[in-house]
């Protein structure tokens, strides 16, 4: 085993222990996939990441992202938390204004903002309408009547999200889902004039049970593309997530002059030290 630098970063919050944590191994050279997956299972966080030297010359580093069950090509809060840890540990980007992350989904740009960091999400792996039969199944596992669903859309930019729009933020907060068998992101609008525009919840299966993710960058990024393209949301806006779990997650969504959607927020380091791997 080797002593490797390690950080645990809370993402999408300014308050430690109130966002979504990610475990970051900063010196992951020579670790095999089995060791990475075993460590991710041991941390039991929604994601654990491993920083490696970039293979693409235009990237600043390469990132591998693991849930307790599998590797992901991309995920949002691990991207921001890992970038935060890399910068805090002395990482210097080739371009002072932008960090370039290499991952399974390709190259992802991360930039500093007034509130922390923001990423430009990679293209969707799957989009478009959801089959009627699957919509009925989603309503069943969410334990709601199908008429409560305003719209659905595939919004998969890596983890596999299926987006579900309900009539209100209140309806989202009231959800008590059963056992889900796919990754479901649910969103509803807060009343006009509210500090937060959207309420978001994310559910996914692990070992036959339903897990709710505290705050989800990838989902918020893909929801932003869907909701802004259909005129249901206008950037800039803030989405709230983790409320039911007692978290204070806030996700800022903006669009630049070129039409790129940036998804971001604050990050704070809660644990820093070394891990034996």
List where the protein language model places each region.
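Active-site proximal loop and beta-alpha junction motif in alpha/beta enzyme cores
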Residues: 1-74, 80-277
């Amino acid at each position: 085993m080797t002593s490797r630098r390690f950080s645990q970063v809370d993402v999408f919050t300014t308050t430690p222990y109130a966002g979504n944590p990610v475990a970051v191994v900063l010196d992951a050279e020579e670790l095999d996939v089995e060791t990475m997956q075993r460590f991710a299972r041991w941390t039991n966080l929604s994601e654990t990441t491993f920083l490696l030297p970039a293979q693409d010359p235009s990237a600043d580093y390469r990132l591998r992202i693991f849930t307790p069950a599998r590797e992901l090509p991309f995920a949002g809060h691990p991207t921001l938390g890992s970038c935060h840890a890399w910068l805090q540990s002395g990482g210097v980007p080739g371009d002072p204004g932008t960090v370039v992350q290499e991952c399974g989904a390709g190259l992802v740009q991360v930039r500093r903002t007034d509130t922390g960091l923001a990423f430009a999400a990679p293209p969707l792996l799957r989009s478009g309408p959801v089959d009627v039969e699957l919509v009925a199944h989603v309503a069943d596992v969410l334990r709601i009547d199908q008429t409560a669903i305003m719209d659905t859309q595939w919004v998969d930019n890596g983890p596999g999200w299926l987006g579900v729009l309900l009539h209100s933020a209140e309806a989202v907060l009231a959800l008590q889902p059963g056992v889900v068998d796919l990754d479901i992101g649910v969103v509803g609008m807060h009343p006009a004039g509210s500090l937060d525009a959207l309420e978001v919840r994310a559910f996914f299966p692990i070992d036959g049970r339903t897990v709710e993710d505290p705050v989800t960058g990838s989902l918020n990024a893909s929801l932003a593309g869907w909701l802004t393209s259909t005129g249901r949301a206008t950037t800039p806006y803030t989405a709230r997530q983790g409320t039911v779990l007692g978290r204070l997650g806030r996700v800022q969504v903006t669009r630049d002059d070129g039409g790129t959607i940036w998804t971001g927020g604050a990050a704070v380091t809660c644990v820093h030290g070394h891990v034996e791997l």
